[in-house]
Amino acid sequence: MISTRGNWPLVPTMDVVVPHARTMADLLEVLDVIVADDAETRGDFWRAQPWVTLPLSSEVRPESYDALAAEAATALRGIRIGIPRMYINADPDAGTAAEPGIGGPTGQRIETRASVIERWESARRDLESAGATVIEVDFPVVSNYEGDRPGAPTIATRGLVSPEYLRREIVDLSAWGWEDFLQANGDPGLHTLAAVDGATIFPHPEGALPDRYTGFDDDIAEYPEWVRANPGIGFQDMPELADGLRGLEETRRLDLEEWMDEHELDAVVFPAVADVGPADMDVNEASADLGWRNGTWIANGNLTVRHLGIPTVTVPMGLMSDIGMPIGLTFVGRAYDDTALLRLAAGFEAIGAPGERRTPPPRTPAL
């Protein structure tokens, strides 16, 4: 819904603009300004591509985001919410596939910290007290993306998206996106990726432990060479893209939207992360083992959420009682359910004990 034009692309099919704000009220005010139609499509791949039709922002946004705050008091009443068992240590099949995942720790069992579970249980009580029904569910959109259990496919083996497309997307399309951004930006000091030494992109810090991104196809250090070897190539010249993009849309429709309809769910929620990695995980092997676990290395949902165009809103759930780190609750919905999710997130923020979920950082002096 928010134009990505002007943002440095990472993976054009996955990139989104994500506003961060102190409160839902602040966020809604920001959205009233930045959610707008953008006539210029260069720099926003999804609006530039011709194969999947997207609505205009003005067709799916409310007249006023700020007005949603007035609905917070009753937003959760009668709502049916699913909590995936895989994120609350309640799914014995998660992570039991012989070779789970699509790279890194994806597909492995998620071990959610006890203090995160405490915050979730408190949040669940508040949701139910506000009139929501919360049920524990499977989560096929992640299981069928990551192959986390026996019999589950991955995004590459499902048959809706080809392996050839997935490689084209993460290598050719991404390198093209970087190059197009630099050319559009027109910085006289650097206007082409071809002028960059790939070895200087994301260099490994001296003394740091090896990263654990094993299994992924991309090496961003090779992007400059791709640009040098493919002058003048655009995304229209990549034959796998049309079917690949349609396959991503169909995957979301089958594994999330039809599944939500089947369970009569208005939304899905889960803790934003399973744990927080130790600060020394770059140099301490034991800490790295903790920090690179599924659910900890990046947020719960991994690549699935952004790759399939699934909207989410995350709001504070409180501090972990043992380590004092904040934890969020992520609300998930169908494509273009953004407004409904914002309404639910505002409703969640409005309930619970005062100061329970959002507290000033203890090391930060008061203003």
Q: Could you describe each region identified by the protein language model?
A:
Residues 124, 165, 173-178:
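Phosphate/diphosphate-binding loops
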Residues 129-151, 231-234:
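Short connector loops at secondary-structure junctions
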Residues 1-103, 121, 126-128, 133, ...:
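Structural helix-boundary/capping segments
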Residues 92-113, 228-233, 287-293:
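A solvent-exposed, charged loop/short amphipathic helix patch at secondary-structure junctions
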Residues 66-70, 110-138, 179, 183-185, ...:
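Acyltransferase
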Residues 144-172, 282-284:
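Charged, often glycine-rich, active-site loop that binds/positions anionic groups
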Residues 14-18, 107-112, 242-246:
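Active-site rim elements
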Residues 12, 28, 154, 177, ...:
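Glycine-rich, small-residue loops and helix-cap segments
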